[in-house]
């Protein structure tokens, strides 16, 4: 990204391995909590630098980062001018019933959405904040992703279009949670940077 004239902000937020197991597990059952405040504090801090144009900030992420993009789209309060979400969770209730990895959703989300103990977790599902979406978003998803099904991406894209928000959908019929085939990788890169350039340059 730097070679395309973008400054990269990649905070070591809760849920990553940089500060031990407790830090790593801090996002479990707290998806819309402290880890999102980590993101916002990082971007707000970097945006104060004289070499940063705070009027041209974008937000991109994949997997949990894709969930984060969808969530921040409803909470960013004008910070960002464009979003890109790759293979992200949009509707956590839908995710609980669709994924092939039940251990993960039981551990990270705390169990099924019909259990009263999980109410706070599912209250942070991005689809519940679509009424606050107002920023162009690109959605990318692999159709053979069984961890986070492509229906999540399609739902997010449709929500943006129904809200009248500029949106683009890129579906790879032959990719899973990652884009592995060289020709698809080239297409991914081109569309990714075309979207950012369109809204940020």
Where are these regions (language model features)?
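Active-site-proximal cap/loop segments of hydrolase catalytic domains
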Residues: 2-4, 10-201
